[in-house]
């Protein structure tokens, strides 16, 4: 049966299955977890899909002559299964029993209590502790884009507007959203496809009610939620697209979580100009957050610099690296803090030891505010808040203004910490109905009910023992179920010993069940106490939760302070352990690095290996704006260029850097163009990707930008590639004025330094010794004389006969030997087991042999040869040479 079954088919179902179909109809885009006793069950297509993903057994339930596919998972283990489904980009609707069985006629009432989506995750077991989990809502028109970023588990909420899709993708890529919310009917819109193509990590796509994106309605919804008269405080009065996206995101949170979302207590507008900008491609190429190898943290800059001890700090550090600062005062404030902590090893270790005891304040507060938390969350929150005064005691010793500023938010919650410490049991249960959440001595009435419940159970045990002695039935047991309450169970072999005052209630296969007036009296006493105790505990829990909700803004501020302190501590620990130095960051356009190292590569070297440091100086004011770097492919050009970009990024994030000294003139953007693997799978050729990214750089770079270009033009023919590379370099020098490192295999580009005053040549030094080539990985002034491609091929393990043949062909080509058509000859070898009549001389590159007799040179060819001989090579630029060559080609055609 499919979910569009007709009314007649639905009417033929059992009442429970009809209830399932009614609920499912309200959530057609979600897998429905339907609570039946101790299991969540799934039916029909949901069951088939879930069983495949979760690798659980698919069974069937009878429906007349048909079988309904079904599967299920235990409710106590559901979070793990839900996490796997959500990680596949699916939504899961949780349908719970909202009343106790037997409280009324008919089946138990059930409702969806929340919908879990990739961007709406609250459970600790499903969330990745060190990563944020953002929903991105987007709207657009012919004037631009609006977006809102909402982290449901922490309450973080931002909105922005962007003039185009490239700028929007750049902003979204900083937080790597897990889910994209678009208006109804827009999931397959070309704009959405274009946006997804620009994001390295593709989010799941969901649709929200189109009306919720409408700016006027969304603005009213936001004003109501935040209880304000206007959105001017959030900077959204003049940003209708951003306001529309923000309203839709907030509505999606409330609709899926069935809550008021009180922890979302602030909204900020994200401005593009305040930070160092990087597009998604540049961030990926530099491996800032994850490795290109496997997408993991290991092998990335974040993996090296993350020495945080809290989840809060880990997420903050990732955010700092994804979006470095653009403000000199803020950069210097972080550097001051890192400098102080890096020089205080005792303070560092003391602070790290305390912070390890602090839980995820943001997400604990978020779960409790959304009604998804339990007593264990209260306990964890209380223990974490109790550590904050110890953190304050360490930070109060510091001189850094930034570190001192953290003490205020960390000192604002002593009453809540004390309350939770007194109120919550040391080891509370997972569920609210199990009892034992509240600490003894916190509430007098609860203590009385607990004592009464405990003593009542003792009385029941006494009754059991007394009845055993009175009847002589040693196997007699006092048991309980929800239908009969407490009863005496007697095996059938002992029925002849049952006293006459026993009242029979039920017969089973092996026993009879009885009650007595005394047992019913004590049952009422015990059950009444249990019910009252349970109800009072839940009431007290809700009162404590309300205290947390009211303190949510202060908890969020404390969490921000913990995260900032932990991220600064991580920078300081790296500086001390790795030998980093404080960079000088100023408003100039200089970039000078002395003995710089690649922060990731140096950490991955084997024992006994050491990284070769390099000096780089870019300063347009001193005729050093664009560096053309030549040298063999394995010599380390790409490593040097990447380390320069990473050094600038680290400095503006507030970190010390891997260098003996560094001066970084503030960068507004970092661009890289180094590879096309990510886009090849999307149907673009290597060369098209290369040109698209280069175009983006040339259109958006400024004289404050830092540009890394690696092998521009390699994806096309030699002459086309050289021409494009030359023109790009000229444009960067003459028009853009940006600081740039330009690695190339076109050695002709070294001549740019003779034509352009701010171009300098660097090459990677190579040493030839005993017929072997040693790559020294050291930058030296000047251009490379050759590429050493065959030596690289040898190092890569090509068979010796292939390497030897390549040397022979190279010598032949480099000697300039031409056939009768003026094309280079290639030496021909006798194939193994040679063919009869094979030539042992020279064969043209295209397989042509000279004509029999004569020179084979036509008058036109001779004229071209004479023109070539008469050319003054020393006075020609590469472009002049290319023009001459093109002219000669036309004459020969």
Swiss-Prot record:
Keyword ATP-binding: yes
PANTHER family: DNA MISMATCH REPAIR PROTEIN MSH1, MITOCHONDRIAL, DNA MISMATCH REPAIR PROTEIN MUTS FAMILY MEMBER
Pfam families: MutS_I, MutS_II, MutS_III, MutS_IV, MutS_V
GO molecular function: ATP binding; ATP-dependent DNA damage sensor activity; damaged DNA binding; mismatched DNA binding
Region (Disordered): 821-858
Protein name per the record: DNA mismatch repair protein MutS
Keyword DNA-binding recorded: yes
């Amino acid at each position: 049966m499919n979910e569009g079954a007709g009314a007649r088919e639905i009417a033929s179902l059992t009442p429970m299955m009809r209830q399932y179909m009614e609920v499912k109809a309200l959530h057609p885009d979600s897998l429905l977890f339907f609570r039946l006793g101790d299991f969540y069950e799934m039916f029909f297509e949901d069951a088939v899909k879930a069983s495949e993903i979760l690798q659980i057994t698919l069974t069937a339930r009878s429906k007349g002559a048909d079988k309904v596919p079904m599967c299920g998972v235990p409710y106590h283990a559901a979070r793990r299964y839900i996490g796997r489904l959500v990680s596949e980009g699916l939504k899961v609707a949780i349908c719970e029993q909202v009343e106790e069985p037997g409280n009324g006629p008919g089946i138990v009432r059930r409702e969806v209590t929340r919908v879990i989506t990739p961007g709406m995750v609250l459970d600790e077991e499903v969330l990745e502790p060190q990563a944020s989990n953002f929903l991105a809502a987007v709207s657009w028109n012919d004037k631009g884009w609006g977006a809102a970023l909402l982290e449901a588990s922490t309450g973080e909420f931002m909105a922005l507007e962007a003039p185009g899709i490239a700028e929007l993708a750049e902003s979204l890529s900083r937080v790597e959203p897990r889910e994209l919310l678009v208006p109804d009917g827009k999931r397959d819109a070309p704009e959405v496809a274009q946006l997804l193509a620009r994001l390295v990590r593709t989010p799941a796509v969901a649709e929200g009610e189109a009306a919720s994106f409408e700016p006027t309605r969304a603005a009213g919804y936001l004003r109501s939620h935040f209880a304000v008269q206007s959105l001017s405080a959030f900077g959204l009065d003049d940003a209708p697209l951003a306001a529309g996206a923000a309203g839709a995101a907030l509505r999606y949170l409330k609709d899926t979580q069935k809550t008021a979302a009180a922890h979302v207590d602030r909204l900020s507008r994200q401005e593009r100009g305040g930070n160092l900008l990087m597009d998604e491609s540049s961030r990926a190429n530099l491996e800032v957050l994850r490795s290109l190898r496997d997408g993991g943290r290991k092998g990335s800059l974040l993996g090296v610099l993350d020495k945080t001890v809290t989840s809060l700090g880990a997420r903050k550090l990732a955010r700092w690296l994804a979006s470095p600062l653009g403000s000199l005062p803020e950069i210097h404030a972080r550097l001051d803090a890192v400098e102080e902590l890096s020089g205080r090893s005792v303070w560092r270790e003391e602070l790290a030891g305390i912070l390890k005891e602090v839980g995820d304040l943001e997400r604990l507060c978020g779960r409790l505010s959304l009604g998804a938390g339990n007593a264990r969350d209260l306990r964890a929150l209380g223990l974490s808040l109790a550590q904050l005064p110890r953190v304050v005691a360490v930070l109060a010793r510091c001189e850094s203004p930034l570190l001192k500023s953290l003490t205020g938010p960390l000192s604002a919650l002593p009453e809540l910490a004390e309350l939770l410490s007194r109120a919550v049991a040391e080891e509370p249960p997972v569920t609210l109905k199990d009892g034992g959440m509240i600490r003894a001595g916190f509430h007098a009435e609860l203590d009385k009910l607990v004592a009464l419940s405990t003593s009542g159970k003792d009385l029941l045990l006494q009754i059991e023992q007394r009845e055993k002695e009175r009847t002589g039935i040693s196997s007699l047991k006092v048991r309980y179920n929800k239908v009969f309450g407490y009863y005496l169970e007697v095996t059938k072999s002992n029925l002849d010993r049952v006293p006459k005052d026993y009242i029979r209630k039920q017969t089973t296969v092996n026993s009879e069940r009885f009650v007595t007036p005394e047992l019913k009296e004590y049952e009422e006493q015990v059950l009444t106490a249990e019910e009252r105790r349970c109800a009072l505990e839940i009431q007290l829990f809700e009162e404590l939760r309300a205290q947390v909700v009211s303190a949510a803004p202060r908890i969020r501020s404390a969490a921000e302070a913990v995260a900032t302190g932990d991220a600064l501590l991580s920078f300081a620990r790296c500086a001390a352990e790795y030998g980093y130095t404080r960079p000088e960051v100023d408003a100039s356009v200089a970039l000078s690095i002395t003995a710089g190292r690649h922060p990731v590569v140096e950490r991955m070297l084997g024992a006994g290996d050491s990284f070769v440091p390099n000096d780089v100086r870019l300063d347009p004011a001193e005729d050093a704006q664009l560096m053309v770097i030549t040298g063999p492919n394995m010599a380390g050009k790409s490593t040097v260029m990447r380390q320069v970009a990473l050094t600038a990024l680290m400095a503006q994030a507030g970190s010390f850097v891997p260098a003996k000294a560094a001066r970084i003139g503030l960068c507004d953007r970092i661009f890289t163009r180094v590879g096309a693997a990510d886009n090849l799978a999307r149907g673009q050729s290597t060369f098209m990707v290369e040109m698209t990214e280069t175009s983006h750089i040339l259109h958006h770079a400024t004289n404050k930008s830092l540009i890394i270009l690696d092998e521009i033009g390699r994806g096309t023919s030699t002459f086309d590639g050289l021409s494009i590379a030359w023109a790009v370099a000229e444009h960067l020098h003459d028009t853009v004025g940006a600081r740039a490192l330009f690695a190339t295999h076109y050695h002709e580009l070294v001549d740019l330094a003779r034509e352009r005053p701010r171009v300098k040549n660097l090459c990677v030094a190579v040493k030839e010794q005993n017929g072997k080539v040693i790559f020294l990985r050291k930058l030296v002034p000047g251009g490379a004389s050759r590429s050493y491609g065959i030596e690289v091929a040898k190092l890569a393990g090509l068979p010796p006969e292939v390497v030897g043949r390549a040397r022979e062909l190279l010598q032949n080509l480099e000697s300039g030997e031409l056939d009768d058509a003026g094309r280079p000859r290639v030496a021909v070898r006798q194939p193994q087991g040679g063919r009869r009549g094979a030539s042992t001389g020279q064969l043209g590159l295209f397989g042509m042999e000279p004509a029999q007799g004569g020179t084979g040179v036509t008058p036109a060819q001779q004229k071209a040869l004479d023109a070539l001989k008469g050319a003054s090579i020393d006075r020609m630029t590469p472009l002049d040479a290319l023009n001459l060559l093109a002219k000669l080609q036309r004459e020969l055609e």
